[in-house]
A protein has these predicted regions:
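Radical SAM enzyme [4Fe-4S]-AdoMet core and its adjacent flexible, acidic
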Residues: 373-492
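Metal-dependent polysaccharide deacetylase catalytic core of the NodB/CE4 family, i.e.
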Residues: 46-133, 153, 208
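Accessory C-terminal segments flanking Radical SAM cores
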Residues: 440-585
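Canonical Radical SAM [4Fe-4S] cluster-binding loop centered on the CxxxCxxC motif
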Residues: 252-295
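Acidic (Asp/Glu)-rich catalytic clusters
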Residues: 34-45, 59-83, 196-202, 303-305, ...
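Active-site-adjacent pocket scaffolds in enzyme catalytic domains
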Residues: 60, 114-208, 217-222, 247-250
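Core AdoMet radical
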Residues: 279-292, 308-322, 333-351, 361-385, ...
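Active-site beta->alpha N-cap acidic-glycine motif
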Residues: 1-73, 118, 208
Length: 585
């Protein structure tokens, strides 16, 4: 697929003064516009002129209207966009952007004939604009904003959003339907064009710009031509079509169902003493055969059947990513539109390399819970691979979380783990609460008292640990919507259950009949909700005040990146009750 090339000029005003004070018979007798037409005729260039209303003693309201017809006839490739009222304009405060923008379109319409020439993507002066002001101009048809060519803050974006944008070159504010495209080439800063051309990644878009004051410089023009010449076979100027296509699957979704999916594998390349498979001696060295194809599972778990976008949590008894089938399954379910978390030990390099090649719009809805088996990783000399795979997933656009299963033998290594984590992950891991799975009450896996256990592991300041420990061993007697809002699913057999211990189940793979399982209600068969960090934070018990799921998974790194990308963080900031019906009692 071709990438796009977009060229724009900031601080425009002299362009319009020039055609006003000179006695040109055609717009393209102007040295400025003749250059633009040369680019268009040779490279099909589409060019945006980001203009002030007034600047350097000239106001665009005085622009001649004698070239109105030529502006109209060329408005498919020549656009005029708002840059600000003047060089002092900043829209981060109470400045009246609405008034300025209305004047701008009024004046441009007068001399350019109609509003088809107005660019609905703009680059505001100094990349300034708070949300209130951007929403004001959005009402006039503005779809998005071009952002800085460096790492500075852009408009109203939060730090995590800005970092994500600078890494992936595009970002969509899904709450407000506003697009952001990163500028990556400032022509006047290019010292050696040949060296710059070597650094251009043909797999990425070229969003280049210069300022009007440099346009008369032949060296600047030559660099622009060189870039167009270099990219003419790989990049097209279809800017708007690209944006709409790139963002079509990225939208504001609220969770419909939470489904904890069991992958029937009891094979693993690790042997951790605290693992429940180890506790119950259920290891099997053979990889499972899956009865149902990934395409069939997608159909069974379609958004239409389930009622909307779901969060699927994929967890194997052994290492989840060992079966090659899982890669195909992930891709199918992501293409269906669901969000997915995968539980993994993070050691299978090949699997992560395969996943990193997924389309970006799929990776944005994918997350990994990297189980941090520190001593096992160290024993197998896999720590370096573990870190590399985490960084690969983050760089690819996926989200992640790092989680330690605490056990008594690990306590003496806590300082070592913390030092390693801060150095390599930029933050401390989250801490879960391990259970003795072969006991009736599934008590905490420790010889310490609950108070001692809390004192030892709370030093990681994990919200996951504090919430999970607060609910551990607490029998739930409230009304629970598990069975209606959340499920347990065996991916191998297709058996869907209310919860881990349940009164009802249905095989949803054998037939595609509607799902008819009732809520657990007040008849929970478990001694306590030992996975409260998921089921209770998503809100299976609406009456219970619980944090959001993103708080169980996210961390802010020392470099201000976050473990959850903005899309996953937004999705995990909602509750099941927002998109499901509650019963009246």
């Amino acid at each position: 697929m071709n990438k796009i090339i977009h060229f724009s000029i900031d601080d425009c005003i002299e362009i319009f003064r020039d055609i006003t004070i000179n006695n040109y018979n055609s717009l393209f007798e102007s040295d400025y516009f003749s250059f633009f037409k040369e680019l268009h005729d040779k490279y099909d260039a589409k060019i945006s002129l980001y203009s002030f209303v007034e600047y350097k003693g000239f106001n665009i309201k005085n622009t001649t209207d004698k070239f109105k017809k030529e502006f109209i006839n060329n408005s498919d490739w020549l656009k005029i966009g708002f840059h600000g009222f003047n060089e002092s304009s900043r829209y981060n405060g109470k400045e009246n952007i609405k008034k300025d923008y209305k004047l701008f379109i009024k004046y441009v319409k007068r001399f350019a004939g109609n509003l088809n020439i107005i660019d609905n993507f703009v680059r505001l002066h100094y990349f300034s604009g708070n949300l209130e002001n951007i929403l004001k101009i959005k009402k006039f048809g503005i779809k998005g904003l071009l952002t800085a060519d460096d790492d500075r803050d852009n408009y109203y974006l939060k730090k995590n959003e800005n970092i994500f944008l600078n890494k992936h070159n595009i970002y969509k504010d899904i709450k407000n339907e506003i697009f952001f495209i990163k500028t990556n080439l400032r022509i006047e800063k290019i010292e050696n064009i040949n060296e710059t051309l070597k650094t251009i990644d043909i797999n990425n878009n070229i969003i280049m710009f210069t300022h009007e004051q440099y346009l008369n410089d032949k060296n600047i023009r030559d660099k622009i031509i060189d870039i167009y010449e270099y990219s003419k076979e790989t990049h097209k100027p279809d800017f708007i079509n690209f944006v709409e296509d790139e963002f079509k699957d990225i939208k504001l979704d609220k969770i419909k169902k939470f489904i904890d999916c069991y992958i029937p594998i009891t094979t693993c390349n690790f042997r951790c003493p605290y693992c429940y498979i180890t506790q119950n001696n259920r290891w099997n060295d053979a990889l499972p055969e899956f009865k149902y194809s990934a395409q069939y599972v997608r159909k069974a778990l379609s958004k239409e059947r389930l009622g909307g976008t779901c969060l699927l949590n994929m967890c194997g008894g052994g290492e989840t990513l060992l079966p090659p089938y899982i890669i195909e399954l992930l891709k199918e379910l992501l293409e269906e539109g669901h969000y997915i978390w995968v539980i993994t030990n993070g050691s299978l390099n090949k699997r992560f390399e395969e996943i990193s090649k997924f389309p970006k719009n799929l990776l944005y809805r994918l997350a990994f819970k990297f189980s941090f088996h520190y001593l096992e990783l160290k024993r197998l000399n896999k720590l370096e691979d573990y870190v590399k795979n985490i960084k690969l997933m983050q760089d690819s656009g996926a989200s992640f979380s790092i989680e330690i299963t605490p056990y008594d033998e690990l306590i003496e290594y806590i300082d070592e783990i913390k030092e390693f984590s801060l150095k390599n992950f930029g933050a401390l891991p989250h801490i879960t609460v391990a259970r003795e799975d072969n006991t009736d009450n599934k008590k905490i896996l420790t010889k310490l008292s609950k108070q001692e256990y809390n004192k030892v592991w709370s030093q990681f300041n994990s919200k996951m640990f504090s919430f999970k420990l607060s609910t551990f061993l607490v029998k739930r007697k409230e009304y629970c919507y598990a069975g209606k809002w959340s499920y347990i699913l065996d991916i191998g057999k297709g058996v869907l259950r209310q919860c881990y211990s349940n009164n009802q189940q249905q095989n949803i793979f054998e037939n595609m009949k509607p799902i008819k399982i009732k809520s657990v209600g007040r008849k929970c068969l478990e001694p306590h909700c030992y996975n409260s960090h998921a089921f209770l934070t998503w809100g299976d018990i609406p009456r219970l005040k619980a944090p959001y799921y993103y708080e169980m998974r996210n961390r802010i790194q020392s470099d201000e990146k976050e473990w959850l990308n903005p899309y996953m963080k937004e999705f995990c900031s909602h509750k099941l009750k927002e998109n499901n019906n509650k019963f009246n009692f």
